[in-house]
Regions:
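Domain-level signal for soluble alpha/beta catalytic cores
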Residues: 1-141
Length: 142
């Protein structure tokens, strides 16, 4: 998908090709998921995962979910375009150790900071670790 993204940015391919590539990637992930999550892994905790409000991309998030399930974590997948309030409510309900936030669009990256601020306001920030990820995310942003 990195190559597809670069070709799209360079104008070599367009939205229809991007959609076909994403669909193909998802089908491939569906095939390998049982292999990645097979076996008896010790339960290591609960991770809430979601793509932030305004972003509809989930391939990277879904890859991380498969790897974390394979490592023994229970995953609560909130999907894409997740509202801050819904993330906060789920953190309270699930008592998770980790919250994973995903963004592919640079325009949605500020939502991650808003989620962290909302966690602080709700008195939840020190109760869990927050992981941010996505193609545009780097160490400086994190």
């Amino acid at each position: 998908m990195d190559i597809v993204g670069k070709r799209f940015a360079d104008g070599d391919i367009y939205v229809p090709e991007m959609l076909v590539s994403a669909k193909t990637m998802k089908q491939g992930l569906d095939i390998i998921k049982p292999l990645l999550t097979a076996g008896e892994a010790e339960h290591r905790g609960t991770i809430i995962m979601g793509t932030v409000k305004g972003d509809l991309h989930d391939i990277g998030k879904n890859l991380v979910i498969m790897m974390m399930e394979g490592a023994g974590f229970r995953i609560v997948d909130m999907g894409v375009d997740v509202k801050i309030e819904d993330l906060i409510d789920t953190v309270k309900k699930e008592e998770a150790e980790v919250l994973g936030l995903s963004a592919l669009l640079t325009t949605t990256m500020p939502e991650m900071q808003k989620v962290i601020e909302a966690l602080e306001e709700a008195g939840l920030r020190n109760q869990l670790k927050v992981i941010v990820g996505g193609a545009p995310i780097d160490q400086g942003f994190a």
